[in-house]
């Protein structure tokens, strides 16, 4: 299978540890005792890498890593057999705390400052990919670099002949379309925000997804949470019906969908199969505490129904 370099040039920058704390109720100003906790290597790019690995697709995680927290991330990926090509930075990789009580609260770390030498090192890694690679960029860039840095990084990949997948929001997503990404995946709310419209029917969603296609994307998936997902290609539009279940992990679900679609598309070039695997990965992660296991993904894949509109 084609090796995928799964790199998220910013959420890759923002490699993180997700520290998940479970507690009945948080009493502010009091000593609270957690019932259970989990620590995962996190960040959008890492999530993509971990799902690709479960699907048996060779990939390399890249980005910035630092400190004892960075070692935890690298060790976690090593344990899953994922290859890494990280740039070392001076400050610690951030920790994001997710408190799951009667309500869910997040406290996100700031993440390291990236200097010019470190950025140049990442640029060298991205410039060295081969024409049959796909590079996944995801999320917002570190604050000291800003999202404009993508306009510098994505062309480095495209000049090698490699494809890019761009999992961005808003203006950053629009700016990326000039590089003809293999896939972009805004959800319906992000699509509304981009065009400043209200989407009432599937036909509206398709109309604006086609506008994104016209601006340069090769495939556009609009995920609609409990209402399924729409894939728009130059040839056709496909709708994947929603699958019912209890949502536990909405954050990793989108990243899992990106991994499932990209991995299958690179293998088979079949957009319908790619959509099915994307929906299977996204849905099964949504119904899991951590990212979905391959067993659960395969089980969910058998429930995915796709119709051509």
Sequence positions of predicted segments:
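Single conserved hydrophobic/aromatic residue that forms the stacking wall/gate
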Residues: 1-9, 13
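Short catalytic helix/loop segments, enriched in acidic residues and glycine
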Residues: 24-45
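Alpha-helix C-terminal capping segments
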Residues: 49-58, 263-268
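Conserved N-terminal subdomain of the carbohydrate kinase-like
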Residues: 54-133, 301-309
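Charged helix-capping and loop-helix junction motifs
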Residues: 120-123, 146-154, 200-206, 240-243
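Conserved phosphate/ATP/ADP-binding segment of small-molecule kinases
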Residues: 151-235
